[in-house]
Amino acid sequence: MIQWLMNIDRRIIFVFVFLGVALPLLANVFLPIKPTRDVIAVYDQFEKVAEDEGIVLLSFSYGASTEPEMQPMARAILRHCFSRNIKVVAVCLWPEAPGLARKVLEEIGDEFGKIYGEDYAFLGFKPGNFAVVLNMGQDFRDAFPQDNWGTPLEKLALTRDVRTLRDFDFVFDLAAGDSIEFWWIPYGQEKYGFPFAGGCTAVMAPDLFPFLQSKQMVGLLGGLAGAAEYETLVGRQDKATAGMSAQSMAHLIIVAFILFGNMAFFLSRRR
């Protein structure tokens, strides 16, 4: 038995790893996920907006290369907003983002029977990076005079009374780059003082922790793990939960085989 453990056929390991990844993705076998403090803070802020029947601004600042991490996050947030009748205005500050933003808005909007122009609006892409954020804070309609299809904002019931960023009860940036720390915080939140939070790729999350400590951000969703935690809070397990469960099960299987191999090695030395 000890000798067998020390010489396990690699194909057996591959089969176990395959099953560990396939079960969550194909059979919806999920591991429990415990939401962290920063994710709960974002959820609670959206709940405060819902209590006041408020309006939020979602900024899409990611592209196709980070879709696997960011799109599940957007889906979970929109499900929360639409299930609680929160009004959503969406903008894009990355040129790759409009297609992804429109897709998820229409998908989740149809899921909850939401009406465009009344429950949500999509204003499309605007070039300029931080200058757009600054412009939205001064005169929102100067930055975005019309929606993605050319309809003036004053003709949409949802955006008729929106003048500046201060008219939003909450601003949330879905970021794959540096838009949170270099655009939204210095030129938006710090200047105009609105409640702000963000979601980012996992590799970016540590860079944003100082903004949580300084209270410039209400909370933070970091990568696929943050999206999975938010799905848990919303009560709808989706792609993020499946992806994190697949990763976790694969890691557990690999660690188990490492432990078995080391145990077999030390036991063989005793003989």
Model-inferred region functions:
Residues 11-26:
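Hydrophobic membrane-insertion alpha-helices, especially the h-region
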Residues 54-62:
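Acidic/histidine-rich, surface-exposed loop or edge segments in extracytoplasmic proteins
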Residues 65-121:
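Membrane-embedded segments
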Residues 210, 214-248:
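Short, aromatic-rich amphipathic segments at membrane interfaces
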Residues 117-205:
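Membrane-proximal low-complexity regions enriched in glycine and acidic/polar residues
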Residues 2-13, 246-249:
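N-terminal membrane topogenic signal
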Residues 31-51:
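Alpha-helical transmembrane signal-anchor/signal-peptide segments
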Residues 5-6, 258-271:
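Juxtamembrane interface at the cytosolic side of transmembrane helices
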